[in-house]
Regions:
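C-terminal output helix
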Residues: 104-113
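C-terminal single-pass membrane-anchor helix
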Residues: 121-153
Length: 153
């Protein structure tokens, strides 16, 4: 489940190519705003996701070829060569948050990560609201039954 970052946002990089991964890690570390971990495989990323809950994952589309799934439990940006590769890869991410081009400038990459980290959470009905609606329905049903009973009697 997505948790808004209280301290420094945690970014999990999932990139198989060592040089590309090191470059991305350097970009985020130079910002001095993020905690960064890097995984070279999806299985390693899933292990990191359990041990080190990230706020966002940046996943290389190449790792998602052949139907491999990235079930990381956090919003994920897909790092892709183009829109068609991104669209194909996003279906294999459990919480897609868009994509960023592999040839993006460092500032654009950081900006895409910031947009995803700061977007408002999806609204959902809380348990108290659901309980109140359920209680209201029970009361209305009881009232309807009472009115039907008094009309027959």
């Amino acid at each position: 489940m997505y948790r808004p970052a209280i301290g420094r946002p945690r970014v999990l990089l999932v990139v198989s190519h060592p040089s590309v991964g090191a470059g991305l890690e350097t970009i985020f570390r130079l910002e001095r705003r993020y905690e960064v971990r890097r995984a070279a495989k999806l299985a390693e990323a899933a292990s990191w996701a359990r041990a080190w809950p990230a706020d966002l994952a940046l996943v290389d589309a190449l790792l998602l070829r052949g139907g491999a799934r990235a079930n990381l439990g956090v919003p994920a940006l897909v790092l892709a060569a183009g829109a068609s590769e991104a669209a194909a890869a996003e279906q294999y991410v459990d919480k897609p948050g868009g994509w960023v081009a592999k040839d993006s400038a460092a500032a654009d990459l950081v900006s895409a990560v910031e947009r995803l980290l700061t977007r408002p959470a999806e609204a959902s009905a809380g348990s108290l609201a659901l309980f109140a609606i359920g209680a209201l329905l029970v009361v209305l049903l009881a009232l309807l039954l009472y009115l039907m009973w008094t009309a027959v009697a």
